[in-house]
Amino acid sequence: IVQSLVGSEMCIRDRIHSATLMHDDVIDEGTVRRGKETLNKVWDNHSSVLIGDYLLSRCFEMMVEDGNLEVLKLLSSTSSKIAQGEVLQLQHKGEVDMLEETYLKIISAKTAELFAAATKVGAILSNAENKEKDALEFYGRNLGLTFQIADDTLDYNAEVKLFGKKIGQDFFEGKITLPIILLCLLYTSDAAD
């Protein structure tokens, strides 16, 4: 039964992730993700938002059916934090002088939160001790931060064929990421010298 629940919860987590990516592509007006056309490019923004909303709604129905309130609470909170991260990112769109601290808050609320939840769900479903749950959540959060920083770096040094979008696309969309923040710090530091 645990194996069945783990499979179900991982499916739920994956659907939540897919829904957030659909919404993210609409917000960012993205047309390519990992070398493939986005849903909003293939269909339209309205369809993408509705399908993303449906996936989220269906995920919560599935969690209620599974009956694990700890998982339901965790993934509900995670979905809320991801949305808050999106709002924070929108508030700072195009803000070239954004602080590294703000950038880290954004990616913590989005990618890191999703990774943390994914690793913690496995611990919850295997009836792990709180110490183990916390350790896996910590690991997932740091893995998410690392993944997002690496992904943001690819925007400036990846091959277009492999990355699937134009180099610098995040910057042109007004997304200020760590490479730009560090470049600005380096430039202002050099200018001061």
Description of each model-found segment:
Residues S8-L186:
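Mg2+-dependent prenyl diphosphate-binding active-site environment of isoprenoid biosynthetic enzymes
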